[in-house]
């Protein structure tokens, strides 16, 4: 589909705006994936707060100029599907990772977080805010239980020594 200059400028501006406000970005090759599966991926992305766009490589390179995702410029080769996480840094990577398990033709090319190329697997395993709070509370709970056990053991040792 031929795009005129105004359409190209609009696409670059739209992707640049998405990149400017994003927490992380993931680039993938969706060649060979069924249309129904891609529609399902787009639906899941909307629910997860991930902006998805299939972009021409030249337009993608121009769109990320001046953003934290300029490091992805060399990755824009071949069919490019780019996802920007807006609510949680690992959302797009987790979404793409789960989708790649179901669709063997789907290939994750690269991921970026805070202006640095990152392993998509690592980015996908980042805990959500709620998970991080839960882990912190577990650590705090375990620490107090450990103190109680050590205190009781110390009292027991004192009684045995006496």
From Swiss-Prot:
Molecular function terms from GO: large ribosomal subunit rRNA binding; structural constituent of ribosome
Alphabetized UniProt keyword annotations: Ribonucleoprotein, Ribosomal protein, RNA-binding, rRNA-binding
Annotated GO CC locations: cytosolic large ribosomal subunit
Xref: PROSITE patterns: RIBOSOMAL_L10
A GO biological-process term: translation
Statement: the UniProt record of this protein carries the keyword Transmembrane helix: no
Assigned protein family: Belongs to the universal ribosomal protein uL10 family.
NCBIfam families per the UniProt record, alphabetical: PRK00099.1-1 (NF000955)
HAMAP family: Ribosomal_uL10
Subunit composition and interactions: Part of the ribosomal stalk of the 50S ribosomal subunit. The N-terminus interacts with L11 and the large rRNA to form the base of the stalk. The C-terminus forms an elongated spine to which L12 dimers bind in a sequential fashion forming a multimeric L10(L12)X complex.
Role played: Forms part of the ribosomal stalk, playing a central role in the interaction of the ribosome with GTP-bound translation factors.
Name this polypeptide is given: Large ribosomal subunit protein uL10
Organism name: Vibrio cholerae serotype O1 (strain ATCC 39315 / El Tor Inaba N16961)
């Amino acid at each position: 589909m031929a795009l005129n200059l105004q359409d190209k400028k609009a696409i670059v501006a739209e992707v640049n705006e998405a990149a400017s406000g994003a927490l992380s970005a993931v680039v993938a090759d969706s060649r060979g994936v069924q249309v129904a599966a891609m529609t399902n991926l787009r639906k899941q992305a909307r629910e997860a707060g991930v902006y998805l766009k299939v972009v021409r490589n030249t337009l993608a390179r121009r769109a990320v100029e001046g953003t934290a995702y300029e490091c992805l410029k060399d990755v824009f080769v071949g069919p490019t599907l780019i996802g920007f996480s807006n609510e949680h840094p690992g959302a797009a990577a987790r979404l793409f990772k789960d989708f790649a398990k179901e669709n063997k033709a789907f290939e994750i090319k690269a991921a970026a977080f805070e202006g640095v190329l990152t392993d998509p697997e690592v980015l996908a395993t980042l805990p959500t805010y709620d998970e991080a709070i839960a882990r912190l509370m577990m650590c705090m709970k375990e620490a107090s239980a450990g103190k109680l056990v050590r205190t009781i053991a110390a009292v027991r040792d004192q009684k045995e020594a006496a």
